[in-house]
């Protein structure tokens, strides 16, 4: 299939650049893929669809303040976007500057902290922060929240809270698992009180999630890699859910990628920790999920392909056209979809 098969027209005015005042105030477009039906609602309406005995799987990754500004020894400005922390004072990162820095170069950040360029690893630079202060603390002091490239504004203190889920615990992501941004603690408590089980896994979202596909055919695309951990509690919760006849709902495409990566190692699913470069596109056979809560994704992106694999390409493009016509808000700070997959799509 061609990448252009997953393109759609999006007016720039529909790209949300700020969050709504309340997390649960977002709109919700419900797509019942089995019956090809759409319903316009607001986010709390998920309580009508996620029933007692169902399982909601969350991603508890926490976004780090991964964007840093500074200058080279020549005085030229640099912008650093961390991709992942690799241990101690080291990290992999993208660097934007007028001239590519060489190994051994020293960069100075806002606040005077020095960073040494150790070398290259593929598309990323290997960096070492020269400081006695632990790297996570340095980032909290000098880093900026890594808002996506389509949000054309500087980050604000409010983004430290709102570009983060209320259940974020494990630092390491450089982009938010945005489907989770719509939940607040009262809504989660209502779901639990109604008999919905929750389980958490971790997938540290990388900046590669925003990278465009540069091939004409999707089969020629090389997917970026991300680190994940699916603990025993998740596989046990899925087993319990299946035994009682419940359904498994993923909160976000990151959860889909994590669960289906673990399932690819064999079913019943076992705990899994490591890297994944799974590419989910039409033709993929889902083994775990029955439904997905997700945001609206960029035209021609791997995430549009993922939701198309679950619900069908034509159904997704039709739903997106409806969302555009109804003035839904798109992307990270935008509105949400609930996709109910045909039961045959998941075991």
Language-model segments: which ranges?
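Surface-exposed, charge/polar-rich loops and edge strands
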Residues: 1-347
């Amino acid at each position: 299939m061609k990448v252009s098969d997953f393109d759609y027209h999006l007016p720039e005015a529909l790209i949300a650049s700020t969050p709504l005042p309340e997390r649960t105030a977002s709109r919700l477009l419900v797509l019942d893929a089995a019956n090809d039906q759409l319903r316009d609602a607001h986010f709390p309406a998920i309580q009508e669809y996620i029933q007692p005995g169902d399982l909601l799987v969350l991603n508890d990754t926490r976004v780090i303040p991964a964007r840093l500004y500074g200058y080279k020894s020549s005085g030229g400005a640099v912008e650093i976007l961390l991709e992942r922390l690799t241990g101690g004072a080291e990290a992999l990162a993208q660097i934007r500057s007028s001239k590519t820095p060489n190994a051994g170069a020293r960069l100075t950040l806002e606040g005077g902290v020095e960073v040494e360029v150790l070398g290259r690893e593929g598309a990323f630079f290997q960096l070492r922060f020269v400081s006695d202060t632990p790297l996570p603390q340095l980032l909290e002091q000098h880093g900026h929240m890594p808002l996506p490239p389509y949000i054309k504004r500087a980050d604000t203190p409010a983004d430290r809270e709102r570009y983060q889920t209320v259940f974020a615990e494990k630092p390491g992501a450089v982009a938010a698992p945005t489907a989770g941004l719509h939940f607040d603690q009262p809504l989660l408590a209502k779901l639990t009180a109604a008999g919905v089980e929750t389980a958490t896994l971790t997938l540290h979202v990388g900046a590669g999630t925003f990278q465009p596909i540069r091939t004409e055919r999707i089969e020629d695309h090389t997917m970026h890699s991300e680190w994940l951990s699916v603990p025993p509690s998740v596989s046990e919760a899925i087993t319990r859910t299946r035994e009682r006849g419940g359904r498994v709902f993923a909160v976000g495409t990151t959860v889909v990628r994590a669960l289906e990566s673990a399932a690819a190692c064999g079913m019943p699913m076992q705990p899994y920790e490591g890297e994944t470069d799974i590419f989910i596109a039409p033709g993929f056979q889902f083994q775990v999920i029955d439904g997905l809560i997700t945001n609206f994704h960029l035209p021609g992106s791997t995430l549009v392909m993922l939701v198309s694999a679950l619900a069908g390409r034509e159904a997704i493009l039709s739903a997106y056209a409806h969302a555009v016509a109804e003035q839904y808000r798109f992307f990270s700070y935008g509105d949400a979809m609930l996709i109910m997959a045909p039961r045959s799509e998941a075991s």
